[in-house]
Amino acid sequence: MTNVLMQTSAGDITIELYTDSMPITAGNFLKLVEKGYYNGLHFHRVIKGFMLQGGCPHSKDPNSNRCGTGSPGYSISDEHLDNAKFSNEIGTLSMANSGPNSGGSQFFINTVHNSFLDWWDKSTPSAHPVFGKVIDGMDIVKKIESCTTGPNDKPTKHQKIISVKKS
C-alpha cells in the first residue's frame, strides 16, 4: 500500500493506493503521480450524490470543451481480480473508462456507494475497478461535491488539483 497526498484548491485529500492488490491500476496512477501528470489539472465532472472525476489532461484549462476526453496517450488493461473485489463504496478511488480496457489517467472518487459500477456485477455493463480509498480529507471531497455545476456537470467555480505526490 502506498499513500498519496492530493492538494486541491479546497484542501488536502490523502489516498491509500492498493498497490499490492491492484498493481496494474494503482501502479499506473502512481507512475503518473511520480511524473507530476495530475499537477494543475481540475475536477472536470462533479455530480452530487455520485462522484468527483478528474485526471483529464485537457482540464489543465478548465474552460476547455475537451475536458473529460483526454488520456495519457495509452490505455491499461482492466484489472478484474477475484481476490481484489473492492466495491465502489464511499471514498473509494476508481478507474474511469469508456469501455473495456480503456482506462488511462481519469479517475473518480465515489461520494456514495455506487455498487452498480462494480466490475463483477454482470447485470450492468459498467466495470470500474477500485484501486484506492480516501483515508483523510473526506470533508474536502464532500466540499468539492457540493460545488455548483453547469453543463456536463462541470464546476462553475474551478476545483483545481494543485499537486499529487507520494506521502
Report each predicted region and the residues it spans.
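Cyclophilin-like peptidyl-prolyl cis-trans isomerases
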Residues: 1-167
